[in-house]
Curated annotation (Swiss-Prot):
2-oxoglutarate binds at residue 510. It is an enzyme of class 1 (oxidoreductase). GO terms for biological process: collagen fibril organization. It comes from Bos taurus (Bovine). Its EC number is 1.14.11.2. Belongs to the P4HA family. Pfam families: 2OG-FeII_Oxy_3 (PF13640), P4Ha_N (PF08336), TPR_P4H (PF23558). It catalyses: L-prolyl-[collagen] + 2-oxoglutarate + O2 = trans-4-hydroxy-L-prolyl-[collagen] + succinate + CO2. Keywords: Dioxygenase, Endoplasmic reticulum, Glycoprotein, Iron, Metal-binding, Oxidoreductase, Signal, TPR repeat, Vitamin C. This is Prolyl 4-hydroxylase subunit alpha-1. TPR repeats lie at residues 205-238. Catalyzes the post-translational formation of 4-hydroxyproline in -Xaa-Pro-Gly- sequences in collagens and other proteins.
Length: 534
C-alpha cells in the first residue's frame, strides 16, 4: 500500500505537467509569472552565495595577515602562550567551521522551488508546437526568416530577436518533420547570422550539415555539392560530408551520362529534381485561405457593396431592443454574414473568460468517420463549455442571441469559449454535418447546426481573421462585436459557401465564444421554403 502511494505521488505531478501551453495564449501568461518567481528565487540564491563568499573572503584576509606575521618569526610567535592557544583553536575548531561553511549548499531553497515549478513547465510537445507555429505564420503571412529573426512583426510592443541557436532549432524541427523547404530557410538564416559575427555555441559545420542535406532533398544537387565542399573546408575529416560528397558526385556523373544518351531523359530529370517550394499538400483552397488571412482577398464589386447596409435592429420588435436597438452591419451578402456591434460588454467578457480559464482543454473536432472527438494539428486552440444555468451572465448572453436571431436557443449547444495559442488557427471547415456524416450530432437529438453566432472577446494586434475561402470574405476580430450566419438553407440543405476558417494569430491574444444553434425548435421560427437552396 505504501509503495502504491509513493508511485502515485511520483507520477501524479507528471500527468498535470503538460497541459499543452502552446495551444492557448491565455494559459501561457501563467508561465510568465512562474518564470518571474523562479528569477526571484535565483536572485535570493545568488545573494546567499555572495554573503557566503564574503564571509570566506574576510576569514581569508584575516588569516593572511596573521600568517604573514607568524612566518617572519615562527618560534617567537608560538612562544607567546596566547598565540599558541589561538593556533590550536583555529586549526582544531575554526578551520572545521570554515570547512562546513564552504561545503554548505546555499542552493537548497532555489532547487526546491525549481523542483516544484518544474512539474508545470512546458514539455517537448509545447516547444515543437511553438516552433511549428512560427513556420505556419511564416507561410501564411509571407514573412521572410530575417523579418522574424529581427522581430519586425506588425503591432508588436515587445521586440524579440532570434539567436543562431533559435534559428538552428527551428530548422531542426522542420527537418524532423521532413519539411526540407523550411529547414533550408532557417539553416540559411543561422548561417547568415554566423557570417555576420554572432557568437554562438552552434558552429557552421553543424548548420552546413543540415543545410546541404535539406537542399539535396529538394533536388538542387549543384547547391548541395557546393555546401558540402564548404563544410569539408571547415572540417576535412567529417565522415558524413565525405560520404555525401562522393555520393553527390556519383549522382551528377550518372545524370550527365544519361543526359548525353537521351534529351527526353534530361527534361524528365529536371522535372524530377526541381521540387523546391510549397509542400505537396498545398491545395488551391489553402492558397485562397492564406491570401484572405493577409487581407488580399476578393474585393466585392461596387454594385454588390451598395447592397450592404448598417442598421439598428430591434429583434423584430423585441421589447428588450425597442428603446435600445442593436447596431447591425452587413459584412457579406452570400452567404449573408451580419456583424452586431457593442453586443457584449467588457464586464461580461471578463466573467466569461474567468469561468472558462480553469476548464480550458485542447480543442477537438468530430471525426467524420467514427464520430469520436479528437485533437488535430489544424486546430490550435483551447476551449471550454459554459452552461446558462451556472451563471446569470451566460444565461443573459444566451437569451440575447435568441432575441436578436429569433431562433430558439434551448436546443443549442452550450456556449463554447476558445482561446487561441501561438499561431492559433482552425483551418477551413464546415460547422454543419454533411450528408456523409449522419451521426455527427445524433447523440444531441437536436438535428443539424442551423446557424453560428460568434463573439469576438478581444482585439487582435495582427492576424486572427475569420475567412470564407469559397466566397472570398474576411471578417476581422473586434472586441465586443459578434458575427452571425446560417449554415443551412431554410430547406435544411447545407450551405457550402459557409466553409470558413480562423486565421493564425500573428501577434496578440485571441478570445472568442460561439453558440451553435440547431434545427429542432426552429420549425416555426424559420419555416422551410419550396426551394432547396433558399
Amino acid at each position: 500500500m505504501i509503495w502504491y502511494i509513493l508511485v502515485v505521488g511520483i507520477l501524479l505531478p507528471q500527468s498535470l505537467a503538460h497541459p499543452g501551453f502552446f495551444t492557448s495564449i491565455g494559459q501561457m501568461t501563467d508561465l510568465i509569472h512562474t518564470e518571474k518567481d523562479l528569477v526571484t528565487s535565483l536572485k535570493d540564491y545568488i545573494k546567499a552565495e555572495e554573503d557566503k563568499l564574503e564571509q570566506i573572503k574576510k576569514w581569508a584576509e584575516k588569516l593572511d595577515r596573521l600568517t604573514s606575521t607568524a612566518t617572519k618569526d615562527p618560534e617567537g610567535f608560538v612562544g607567546h602562550p596566547v598565540n599558541a592557544f589561538k593556533l590550536m583553536k583555529r586549526l582544531n575548531t575554526e578551520w572545521s567551521e570554515l570547512e562546513n561553511l564552504v561545503l554548505k549548499d546555499m542552493s537548497d531553497g532555489f532547487i526546491s522551488n525549481l523542483t516544484i515549478q518544474r512539474q508545470y513547465f512546458p514539455n517537448d510537445e509545447d516547444q515543437v508546437g511553438a516552433a511549428k507555429a512560427l513556420l505556419r505564420l511564416q507561410d501564411t503571412y509571407n514573412l521572410d526568416t530575417d523579418t522574424i529573426s529581427k522581430g519586425d512583426l506588425p503591432g508588436v510592443k515587445h521586440k524579440s530577436f532570434l539567436t543562431v541557436e533559435d534559428c538552428f532549432e527551428l530548422g531542426k524541427v522542420a527537418y524532423t518533420e521532413a519539411d526540407y523547404y523550411h529547414t533550408e530557410l532557417w539553416m540559411e538564416q543561422a548561417l547568415r547570422q554566423l557570417d555576420e559575427g554572432e557568437v554562438s555555441t552552434v558552429d557552421k559545420v553543424s548548420v552546413l550539415d543540415y543545410l546541404s542535406y535539406a537542399v539535396y532533398q529538394q533536388g538542387d544537387l549543384d547547391k548541395a555539392l557546393l555546401l558540402t565542399k564548404k563544410l569539408l573546408e571547415l572540417d576535412p575529416e567529417h565522415q558524413r560530408a565525405n560520404g555525401n560528397l562522393k555520393y553527390f558526385e556519383y549522382i551528377m556523373a550518372k545524370e550527365k551520362d544519361a543526359n548525353k544518351s537521351s534529351s527526353d531523359d534530361q527534361s524528365d530529370q529536371k522535372t524530377t529534381l526541381k521540387k523546391k517550394g510549397a509542400a505537396v499538400d498545398y491545395l488551391p483552397e489553402r492558397q485562397k485561405y492564406e491570401m484572405l488571412c493577409r487581407g488580399e482577398g476578393i474585393k466585392m464589386t461596387p454594385r454588390r457593396q451598395k447592397k450592404l447596409f448598417c442598421r439598428y435592429h430591434d429583434g423584430n420588435r423585441n421589447p428588450k431592443f425597442i428603446l435600445a436597438p442593436a447596431k447591425q452591419e452587413d459584412e457579406w451578402d452570400k452567404p449573408r454574414i451580419i456583424r452586431f456591434h457593442d453586443i457584449i460588454s467588457d464586464a461580461e467578457i471578463e466573467v466569461v473568460k474567468d469561468l472558462a480559464k480553469p476548464r480550458l482543454r485542447r480543442a477537438t473536432i468530430s471525426n467524420p468517420i467514427t464520430g469520436d472527438l479528437e485533437t488535430v494539428h489544424y486546430r490550435i486552440s483551447k476551449s471550454a463549455w459554459l452552461s446558462g444555468y451556472e451563471n446569470p451572465v451566460v444565461s443573459r448572453i444566451n437569451m440575447r442571441i435568441q432575441d436578436l436571431t429569433g431562433l430558439d436557443v434551448s436546443t443549442a449547444e452550450e456556449l463554447q469559449v476558445a482561446n487561441y495559442g501561438v499561431g492559433g488557427q482552425y483551418e477551413p471547415h464546415f460547422d454543419f454535418a454533411r450528408k456523409d456524416e449522419p451521426d455527427a450530432f445524433k447523440e444531441l437529438g437536436t438535428g443539424n447546426r442551423i446557424a453560428t453566432w460568434l463573439f469576438y472577446m478581444s482585439d487582435v494586434l495582427a492576424g486572427g481573421a475569420t475567412v470564407f475561402p469559397e466566397v472570398g470574405a474576411s471578417v476581422w476580430p473586434k472586441k465586443g462585436t459578434a458575427v452571425f450566419w446560417y449554415n443551412l438553407f431554410a430547406s435544411g440543405e447545407g450551405d457550402y459557401s459557409t466553409r470558413h476558417a480562423a486565421c493564425p494569430v500573428l501577434v496578440g491574444n485571441k478570445w472568442v465564444s460561439n453558440k451553435w444553434l440547431h434545427e429542432r425548435g426552429q420549425e416555426f421560427r424559420r419555416p422551410c421554403t419550396l426551394s432547396e437552396l433558399e
